[in-house]
């Protein structure tokens, strides 16, 4: 089992968790391929962290499974923007800590059509 951790990424944790939930339990190679075509900053970051976790354990991406994929909230950078009448309002720039754990395995996440065929006995 190998791990990779990327801290203080300028990325909203709520937006990154949407992508992280999709790849949990997937084959690492399949996850990297699907993240490559996801038009999202979080997908690019998660793809690199998954690849790093696979490399850290000297595993083959075809046989590696994503055991856990977690996105925790980091510190929030606070900035201000000038407004009318001499005022200023706050801007929050959230950061995240991305944690991916990969283990050796053979199973792949089943697609809906595969599950449907199994239920029908095909």
From Swiss-Prot:
Residues 102-122 are annotated as: Disordered. GO terms for molecular function: rRNA binding; structural constituent of ribosome. One of its GO terms (biological process) is translation. One of its GO terms (cellular component) is cytosolic large ribosomal subunit. The keyword Ligase does not apply. InterPro entries: Ribosomal_uL22, Ribosomal_uL22_bac/chlpt-type, Ribosomal_uL22_bac/org-type, Ribosomal_uL22_CS, Ribosomal_uL22_sf. Part of the 50S ribosomal subunit. This protein binds specifically to 23S rRNA; its binding is stimulated by other ribosomal proteins, e.g. L4, L17, and L20. It is important during the early stages of 50S assembly. It makes multiple contacts with different domains of the 23S rRNA in the assembled 50S subunit and ribosome. The globular domain of the protein is located near the polypeptide exit tunnel on the outside of the subunit, while an extended beta-hairpin is found that lines the wall of the exit tunnel in the center of the 70S ribosome. Belongs to the universal ribosomal protein uL22 family. This is Large ribosomal subunit protein uL22. It comes from Helicobacter pylori (strain Shi470).
